[in-house]
Regions:
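Juxtamembrane intracellular "pre-TM" segments in multi-pass secondary transporters
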Residues: 5-14, 193-217
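Extracytoplasmic
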Residues: 19-52, 70-73
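Residue-level signature of mid-helix packing/kink "hotspots" within the transmembrane helices
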Residues: 35, 63-71, 155-156
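Helix-breaking motifs and short loop linkers at transmembrane-helix boundaries and internal kinks
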Residues: 49, 81, 102-108, 119
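Conserved MFS/SLC helix-loop-helix module at the cytosolic interface between two early adjacent transmembrane helices
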Residues: 68-104
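Paired small-residue
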Residues: 96, 107-115
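Helix-loop-helix hairpin linking two adjacent transmembrane segments in secondary transporters
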Residues: 108, 137, 146-191
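Cytoplasmic helix-loop-helix junction between adjacent transmembrane helices
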Residues: 112-151
Length: 217
């Protein structure tokens, strides 16, 4: 009997190289979030009427969830398909990063960054697992090296965006630019998945999350 929730991967007629390039774009967008706040803190503190020290909580909020979420995502990516999971988290990231540009208080921004970190934290480890699945062993090191280059460029872009674009456009518009990067990655990933994909079962996703975070008895 066929599985009620088949794992959806990119269509077989699609090139793995293009799939990996799109994952690198997603990784670029994810890593651009990591350092973007460094240069924006003075603007944020001034606009939200607080101190730079207090504003730094938004950096901590992102780092906490971005790192800790990686402890539980493996089983979920395996269950629902790594490529589709990355596409879903990219779409979620686009929305959450855009929300960061609309908040009016520091606690709201901290919560938005907390949620953004939880979404972005899925992208790179699941993408690297997918690359390992579809790449021949003798080429894996080379392909992973190219994929990681996208992450490094994303960090550099994020830091530059926080400084240069922050001065030119303001801190809120920087988040809208980064949300656009996530949206661009989402569009490419969804196209690569194909039109015959099925939506994930929300109840099944919730069960997998509970199983992942519940310690064994």
């Amino acid at each position: 009997m066929p599985s009620p929730n088949p794992i959806i991967q990119p269509r077989p007629d699609k090139s793995p190289t293009r799939s990996i390039i799109l994952l690198a774009v997603a990784g670029f967008a994810s890593q651009a979030q990591v350092r973007v706040m460094d240069s924006l803190l003075p603007q944020i503190a001034s606009d939200l009427h607080t101190t730079i020290g207090l504003a730094a909580m938004v950096v901590t909020a992102y780092a906490v969830t971005h790192g800790s979420i990686q402890l539980v995502i493996g089983p979920i990516g395996d269950r629902f398909g790594k490529y589709r999971t990355v596409a879903l988290t990219c779409a979620t990231g686009a929305v959450l990063v855009a929300v960061c540009g609309t908040v009016s208080t520091l606690p709201q921004l901290a919560l938005a960054r907390l949620a953004t970190g939880a979404a972005a934290g899925w992208i790179i480890p699941i993408s690297m697992a997918y690359v390992g699945d579809v790449t021949p062993h003798d080429r894996l090191q080379q392909i992973l090296g190219r994929y990681i280059s996208g992450q490094i460029l994303g960090q550099l872009f994020g830091q530059a965006a926080g400084g240069v674009l922050g001065d030119l456009l303001g801190w809120r518009n920087v988040f809208f630019v980064l949300a656009g990067l996530f949206a661009l990655a989402t569009a490419g990933l969804v196209f690569e998945l194909g039109v015959d994909r099925r939506p994930a079962n929300a109840a099944a996703v919730a069960r997998e999350v509970c199983l992942a975070v519940t310690p064994p008895s």
